[in-house]
Structures are given as C-alpha cells and as structure tokens.
C-alpha cells in the first residue's frame, strides 16, 4: 500500500492549496452574514432597563417577529429574522420607550472580531 506515492509530489502544494481554498469558501457565508440586531441602552447611569417580556409583547402585537431578547451588560440586545423586522422594531421602540433610552442598530462585527 503506497498512498503517498499514488500521486506525484509536485501535486502536493496544489492539493494543500485546494484544501485551504475549500475551507475558505465554506467559511464565507458565516463571515458575510449580516446580523439584524437592535440594542436598547439607557442614556442616564442608574436608570432601569425596560422589561424584555413587555417589549416582546409590544413588538409581537405590531406583527414584528423576534428571534431573541438578551441582556448584555447595560443593554438589551434584540435579534430579528430580517432587516425589515429590525427597522420596524426600531420605529416602534422609539415611540414606545420614553426619553432616556437609546435605540440603535447594534454592530456585532466588533463583538465577533474580539471573540
């Protein structure tokens, strides 16, 4: 049995390069995926965060589908299925929440690069 001698050694760099190319291509969809995330923060230190269940009920009543709501330090992070849901939620949340809350698109690229 001669598995390494079944092909010429000059093919080895091409096989390794091909393997790296396949790995890179398979990872591209996960790297290019855009998260649809809204972040709610308080603008004044010490102010309480809104209740996540209340926000879920209000957004659901408006027909906005939520994937998840999670606390993250001094913020609530809300994940949505698509960008339209995220934009609609931002409009509803800005009307719903009183002054003192910051509702913004959350950039997860910074968090992913640190992980």
Swiss-Prot record:
KW Transmembrane helix (keyword) present: yes
Disulphide bonds in the chain: none
Ranges annotated as spanning the membrane: 11-31
A Pfam family assignment: SecD-TM1
An annotated GO cellular component: plasma membrane
InterPro entries according to UniProt: Modulator_MzrA (IPR026574), SecD-TM (IPR027398)
Protein topology in the membrane: Single-pass membrane protein
Family statement drawn from the similarity comment of this UniProt entry: Belongs to the MzrA family.
Job of this protein: Modulates the activity of the EnvZ/OmpR two-component regulatory system, probably by directly modulating EnvZ enzymatic activity and increasing stability of phosphorylated OmpR.
Name of the protein in question: Modulator protein MzrA
Gene from which this protein is expressed: mzrA
